[in-house]
Curated annotation (Swiss-Prot):
<comment type="subunit">
    <text>Component of the IFT complex B, the core composed of IFT25, IFT27, IFT46, IFT52, IFT74, IFT81 and IFT88 as well as associated subunits IFT20, IFT57, IFT80 and IFT172. Interacts with IFT81; the interaction is direct: within the IFT complex B, IFT74 and IFT81 mediate the transport of tubulin within the cilium. Interacts (via basic region) with beta-tubulin (via acidic region); interaction is direct.</text>
</comment>
<protein>
    <recommendedName>
        <fullName>Intraflagellar transport protein 74</fullName>
    </recommendedName>
</protein>
<feature type="region of interest" description="Disordered">
    <location>
        <begin position="1"/>
        <end position="99"/>
    </location>
</feature>
<keyword id="KW-0175">Coiled coil</keyword>
<comment type="function">
    <text>Component of the intraflagellar transport (IFT) complex B: together with IFT81, forms a tubulin-binding module that specifically mediates transport of tubulin within the cilium. Binds beta-tubulin via its basic region. Required for ciliogenesis.</text>
</comment>
<comment type="similarity">
    <text>Belongs to the IFT74 family.</text>
</comment>
<dbReference type="GO" id="GO:0031514">
    <property type="term" value="C:motile cilium"/>
</dbReference>
<keyword id="KW-0969">Cilium</keyword>
<dbReference type="GO" id="GO:0060271">
    <property type="term" value="P:cilium assembly"/>
</dbReference>
<keyword id="KW-0970">Cilium biogenesis/degradation</keyword>
<feature type="coiled-coil region">
    <location>
        <begin position="139"/>
        <end position="633"/>
    </location>
</feature>
<dbReference type="GO" id="GO:0048487">
    <property type="term" value="F:beta-tubulin binding"/>
</dbReference>
<dbReference type="InterPro" id="IPR029602">
    <property type="entry name" value="IFT74"/>
</dbReference>
<feature type="region of interest" description="Basic region">
    <location>
        <begin position="1"/>
        <end position="132"/>
    </location>
</feature>
<dbReference type="GO" id="GO:0035735">
    <property type="term" value="P:intraciliary transport involved in cilium assembly"/>
</dbReference>
<dbReference type="GO" id="GO:0030992">
    <property type="term" value="C:intraciliary transport particle B"/>
</dbReference>
<keyword id="KW-0966">Cell projection</keyword>
Length: 641
């Protein structure tokens, strides 16, 4: 692999020397003599007149690439250098300064290099730079280093994970121990409560039967609570089972609905999806409206509570409601008075207009009802069509069979009805036939009698037609007269009813006027009472003074009660201090501590006894020995036999 040239090679190139080819002898290049320095032609090695070599930049390519005098191939110094060779170091500047000194040029102090520690002399060529080409070994070393770092981090993470697992195991064991200890503490607290209860009973010298009664009462109460808990648990299990059954039914219904939905045509499915989305939107709106309504209810309750706490606001609200009611009554009375001053013709016209309006409203409502019924029928037909469309060919066949079966049932029903009613209908028809025959015979007899009476005075055919036409005309006139008479009767009845209404309306108006006059007088009296604001203010002031007096009395009682409570508290503290100083109290505390120690000792002895019993448990061994003896006896008996 080719390596870039070092700084020494660059210095030689700057001084006019080049590196010889690899494997050959270094030949001295042409260099100017001392006397030829001033007259040397301008070339790549010649600096401009008046220019400083030290202040010049790095050497150009003309100083690098020329072949040697022998014409051999260029050395490795003429190869492509790395990025570090683009900026020459201070060593190259020192070589350039040496060349300038040999050329006899004057050094410029202001262009001297500045080192790390200030202005100093020029340094010689420093050591070369590091690696310039990143080859395979470099990357392999980097990969090894990264792999070692990853392995180190992995091992650290594994150790941390193991530490966390150990801590988790310790935490689980400690948690289990804490739960066991909490249970044990709870049991001990219950035992301590029982001991304290017994100690209280012993200290109060309660008889044994009282303790037994309390024990029985507590036992009964615990049994009742246990039964109640069992009932609640049973009810909960029943409810959970019912809920599961309901959920299973809902899932089945949902599955059937999904199946029917999948069997629907795309248009109906899209319509169903649209309706479902609309339903969800309506449910969301309903929920939002319910929330708003709840907020309004809460605000209303808060306002009502505030109003209930403030008696002045309550009184003000009552007065405002009374004023509003009186104002409405005043308007009503004014309107009724105005109506009472009107003539009967105007009242009748208003009544007729009101009747017309009512009739119009009734017709509109009837029309709306018809439209709604039509819409309901359309929606029912649509639902039927949707239900029929989802069932497919099987549903159509089933529907056709059902229709045929219904037709057969209807025909059979009609046939049975006909057979059941045939005798009665036959008798009726025979009776009707007999009556018609008797009528025909009677008519023939009358005709024979009339022919015998009239003889040859029978009218001609033309005269008979005229008489028949005249008879029809008379019948028509009679019908018209009867129709006119009926219409006149109806109109007469309507007029009589209107007259009765008018008569009753006059009486009613008079009665209402009398009542309104009485109500007006009563309202005027009430308005006079409410109109005196001074009386109301005087009553309110009197009530306020009475309340203030009651408040002062209550405050005095409050202070008195506080003083009594403070005095009783001091007495209680004195009694407690006296009790603490009493010898019996000290002895009782000592006995309580001794009882606790004895209880602890008893508990430890019980544990010790249980442990020893478990260690010296011989029953299992005895049972095993007995079983072995039985087996041996059986084998001995078999051997003897």
């Amino acid at each position: 692999m080719d390596r870039p040239s070092s700084r020494g090679a660059l210095a030689l190139g700057a001084g006019g020397l080049g590196k010889a080819p690899t494997g050959g002898a270094v030949q001295q290049p042409d260099r100017p003599m001392t006397g030829q320095r001033g007259a040397a032609p301008a070339g790549p090695m010649r600096a401009p007149a008046g220019a400083s070599i030290i202040g010049a930049g790095p050497p150009g390519t003309a100083m690098r690439g020329g072949p040697g005098p022998a014409g051999g191939p260029p050395g490795t110094a003429y190869k492509r250098m790395g990025t570090a060779s683009q900026r020459p170091g201070t060593g190259q500047q020192a070589a350039a300064a040496a060349a300038a000194a040999r050329a006899g040029q004057q050094l410029q102090v202001e262009n001297r290099p500045i080192t790390n520690h200030g202005v100093s002399g020029m340094k010689t060529a420093a050591a070369g730079v590091g690696r310039q080409v990143l080859d395979k070994n470099y990357f392999m070393n980097e990969l090894r280093q990264k792999r070692m770092e990853i392995a180190q981090v992995t091992s650290n993470m594994k150790s941390d994970l193991e530490a966390l697992e150990r801590k988790q195991a310790q935490y689980n064991s400690m948690d289990k121990r804490a739960s066991d200890l909490s249970k044990e503490v709870k049991i001990l607290q219950e035992a301590l409560a029982d001991y304290n209860t017994v100690l209280d009973k012993v200290g109060s010298q309660a008889p044994v039967y009282v303790i037994q009664q309390e024990f029985a009462a507590l036992k009964d109460r615990n049994e009742q609570q246990r039964k109640r808990v069992d009932e609640v648990l049973t009810e909960r299990l029943n409810l959970e089972s019912k809920a599961k059954q309901a959920e299973s039914k809902m899932s089945e219904i949902q599955a059937s609905m999904d199946q029917r939905l999948n069997s629907m045509p795309p248009s109906q499915r899209n319509e169903y999806t649209t309706l479902v989305a609309e339903q969800q939107q309506l449910q969301a709106d309903s929920k939002r409206f319910e929330e708003v309504l709840d907020e309004l209810d809460k605000a209303l309750q808060a306002s009502e509570g505030e109003l209930a706490r403030n008696p002045f606001k309550q009184r003000s609200l009552q007065l405002q409601e009374q004023i509003r009611a009186l104002t409405e009554k005043k308007y009503e009375l004014t309107e009724e008075e105005r109506q009472s001053k009107r003539s009967p013709e105007e009242l009748r016209a208003d009544l007729m207009a009101k009747i017309k309006r009512d009739n119009t409203e009734v017709e509109q409502m009837t029309q709306q009802i018809r439209e709604l019924q039509d819409q309901i029928k359309k929606m029912e037909e649509r639902v039927k069509s949707l239900g029929g469309a989802t069932s497919g060919a099987a549903a159509a066949e089933e529907k056709a069979n059902r229709e045929k079966f219904e037709e057969l049932l209807a025909k059979e029903r009609d046939l049975n009805n006909f057979m059941d009613g045939f005798p009665s209908r036959k008798a009726a028809k025979m009776q009707e036939k007999q009556q018609k025959e008797d009528g025909i015979v009677g008519v023939l007899e009358k005709m024979v009698k009339m022919q015998g009476i009239i003889g040859s005075n029978l009218p001609s055919q033309k005269k008979y037609k005229e008489m028949q036409d005249e008879l029809e005309y008379k019948k028509m006139q009679l019908e018209n007269t009867q129709t006119t008479q009926e219409r006149l009767k109806e109109e007469l009845t309507m007029r009589r009813t209107e007259l009765e209404k008018i008569d009753t309306l006059e009486d009613k108006i008079k009665l209402e006027l009398t009542q309104l006059a009485e109500r007006q007088e009563a309202m005027e009296k009430e308005m006079g009472e409410f109109g005196s604001v001074e009386d109301i203010q005087r009553k309110a002031n009197a009530a306020r003074e009475r309340m203030e007096g009651l408040r002062s009395v209550l405050l005095k009682r409050k202070d008195l009660l506080r003083s009594i409570v403070a005095e009783r508290g001091l007495k209680f503290q004195a009694k407690r201090a006296q009790l603490q100083d009493h010898n019996l109290q000290v002895q009782l505390e000592k006995m309580e501590a001794k009882l606790k120690n004895l209880s602890a000792g008893v508990f430890e002895m019980d544990e010790f006894i249980k442990a020893k019993e478990s260690e010296t448990n011989y029953r299992q061994l005895a049972s095993n020995i007995a079983a072995l003896v039985d087996d041996l006896n059986v084998h001995v008996k078999k051997a003897v036999v």
